[in-house]
């Protein structure tokens, strides 16, 4: 096992612990809490894959971080912060829409790279809108938090979420998964649109008809 993979996991475990303390003291906002929950699932998956105990990894991660902070000068820290671009959190969905449980009458699930796609195949002849919460950097989608498909009545009929055991995905992974979700919903004569916000940051433009320019690969 690569030592950098292990140390990266250990540091991530400790930093998650620090962020959890922030939430416990009621200092975190909704996006902060959302990322914390998502990263917890990711860490559990990574720990299982690596065969590492999260609690033990957290203690080692603390030692690594303390050593770095001890050697880090305030001036170097200022320069690092100034040169690092800040990401933004984009919310198409409300907290209620993001956290709501939903059930499928005819479930279908497909894994597309590091993303999991879920579709209720019982849904027919509906107008459906795809909305997502995600982070943006340099005006491009950076990390998908969660994407959901809503009918006009507000029912959830589809979803795309990152796999906890497969951290990291690209903007192309997200667009490919959206294409698969659209294709699965349109198979039952549903009309699918993508929110303007998601179109803008994933494809760089937005169409009034709500349809982004999908490549042949993305239309599967």
Curated annotation (Swiss-Prot):
InterPro entries: NS1, NS1A, NS1A_effect_dom-like_sf, uS15_NS1_RNA-bd_sf. One of its GO terms (cellular component) is host cell nucleus. Transmembrane segments: none annotated. Residues 180-215 are annotated as: CPSF4-binding. Pfam families: Flu_NS1. Belongs to the influenza A viruses NS1 family. This is Non-structural protein 1. The gene is NS.
